[in-house]
UniProtKB/Swiss-Prot annotation:
Family note: Belongs to the mimivirus BTB/WD family.
Protein name per its UniProtKB record: Putative BTB/POZ domain-containing protein L89
Superkingdom as given in the UniProt entry: Viruses
Comp. bias (Acidic residues): 224-240
Alphabetical list of Pfam families matching this protein: BTB
Positions of the UniProt region annotated as Disordered: 219-246
Domain BTB: 16-86
Length: 502
């Protein structure tokens, strides 16, 4: 007797004991099937042909989500393979149909939905149900110009916590690496050929730094057009009309300002000139995004340059050992060995000087937190006086202001102390003696980054627990940056806010 294989048995329809009609409301597909094969392959058909009236029927019609997909699934019971489908609709419909037949199914991650099909995609996802995987699919495929206001509030709220909106920029041994908190891996690496001597915090997706590099990077020759006047570096000079050098040939190694674009992962070099001479950035760089200007420390002089026009604007004063600068409401704050200096930014008028002996200074919109060796001082920007100060029992390692929580964080090698920014009362403290703290960085919400001598930790300020840790030695710089989903999550939160206040 000839032995039938199952694909041939199905194709010829021999010994078929039932005609199965699949109806999705748009298309009907009729199959000559064998009840025993469907019975053994699918819990759905096992129930149908084992316990219900259909077990004696020679024709059965069932309503399915997609007739074609259901037909291909049933054919697979006979060992019949169909061409692989990459269409997003087919993949999702297959998941729905397999689930209907009681079969094991797993949603694939590589769903790519055309912009024109996004609303249809949302309807399909609603049939599947909202869970972490389907919500990720929505976020991954949402059009850039999509109006989230048309989605229900509960769906928007469930989408917010699915992806972390931040990544972490890590610089180690002149290698720039971006660590994704979503994939738990490095997504970008950039080798910088040179030595970096100073960093500024990331602003407007740009990291400004002073570097000595021979890289053939994108070079912006920031020449000005001034003369060689002897008094051009006086405190009250407004602007200098410098003439661009006729020729400039970069030396093999150039001390310059480098700007790393954390979105495009590119580095651009800037050479600045004053009095027809190229300056050598030394110990300070401060980017002012609202004006697209940069403050540069230059052999004791603090100079201001415009990045749009590439011109020298004016000298801001002489501060041989400046450690930090900050601009807020037309006030320039400069920290040097002699104290905290306040200067009217638009006029260079000196306003105030406050004597401090610390370089550890944090700026808030209202206050300045100064961490000396064993003392914390809170200085008011409005009154320009000390509003509070207190002694610490151990040497201060780091200080941090978290405006969103109204927190002042003070860290010693053993503990983290949390103070209320308004009342200045201590809220709580946490033991961190096992982490070998080097510095603190703001992260998000109630979390901070503890930089250690062997990596960094993500620390929960409420519980005092480490929720994630990364062993990376010799970190030169670490900062949070906008991640892949930053803009999308920002739009979702905006829509939630509108719905809650409507």
């Amino acid at each position: 007797m000839d032995k039938y294989n199952l694909p041939e048995l199905f194709a010829k329809g021999e010994l078929s004991d039932c005609q199965l009609v699949l109806d999705d409301g748009k298309e009907k597909i009729s199959l000559n099937i064998h009840k025993c094969i469907l019975y053994t392959a699918s819990p759905y058909f096992k129930g149908m042909f084992g316990n219900f009236s259909e077990q004696k029927s020679n024709k059965v019609t069932i309503t399915v989500h997609n007739s074609l997909v259901s037909s291909n699934i049933i054919k697979s019971f006979y060992g019949i393979t169909t061409p692989k489908q990459n269409n997003w609709k087919y993949k999702l419909d297959k998941h729905i149909c397999k689930n209907f037949f009681g079969l094991k199914t797993r949603l694939t991650n590589n769903i790519k939905v055309p912009k024109t099909n996004f609303n249809e995609f949302l309807d399909t996802i609603e049939l599947i149900g909202y869970n972490e995987k389907t919500l990720k699919m929505i976020i991954n495929n949402v059009p850039k110009d999509y109006n989230f206001d048309q989605l229900p509030l509960d769906l928007l709220q469930s989408m917010v916590g699915i992806y972390d909106k931040y990544d972490i920029l890590i610089i180690k041994d002149s290698t720039f690496s971006v660590w994704s908190l979503n994939t738990k891996r490095y997504t970008h690496n950039f080798k910088f050929n040179g030595k970096i001597s100073d960093f500024e915090s990331v602003k407007n997706n740009k990291l400004f730094m002073i570097a000595n590099t021979s890289d053939n990077l994108d070079v912006s020759d920031c020449s000005d057009s001034s003369d060689d006047s002897d008094n051009s570096d006086s405190d009250n000079s407004d602007s200098e009309s410098l003439e661009k050098p006729k020729k400039f040939f970069p030396s093999k190694d150039d001390q310059c300002i480098c700007v790393f674009d954390v979105k495009k992962y590119t580095v651009k070099k800037y050479f600045f000139y004053k009095n027809n001479k190229k300056i050598l950035p030394k110990d300070i760089v401060c980017y002012i995004p609202e004006y697209n200007q940069v403050i540069v420390g230059n052999s004791g002089y603090i100079d201001l340059f415009d990045l749009d026009s590439k011109n020298f604007i004016r000298n801001l004063g002489v501060y041989e050992t400046a450690y930090a600068t900050h601009v807020d409401n037309d006030i320039l704050y400069i920290v040097d060995d002699f104290g905290l200096h306040l200067i009217q930014f638009s006029t260079n008028k000196k306003l105030h000087k406050f004597e401090i002996i610390s370089h550890r200074v944090n700026f808030d919109t209202k206050n300045i937190v100064i961490g000396e060796k064993f003392k914390i001082t809170i200085w008011s920007k409005e009154t320009r006086h000390v509003v509070s100060e207190w002694e610490m029992s151990a040497k201060i390692k780091s200080t941090l202001i978290i405006p969103g929580l109204n927190y002042i964080i003070v860290a010693t090698s053993q503990r983290i102390y949390i103070y209320d920014l308004n009342t200045l009362l201590r809220i709580k403290k946490h033991d961190i003696s096992s982490h070998h703290l080097v510095d603190l960085q703001e992260f998000k919400e109630k979390f901070i980054i503890i930089v250690c001598d062997c990596g960094f930790r993500i620390f929960d300020l409420d519980s005092g627990l480490v929720i994630d840790e990364f062993d990376i030695e010799s970190i030169s710089y670490i900062n949070i940056i906008e991640g892949q989903y930053y803009d999308t999550i920002k739009k979702i939160k905006h829509s939630i806010s509108k719905k809650l206040t409507a």
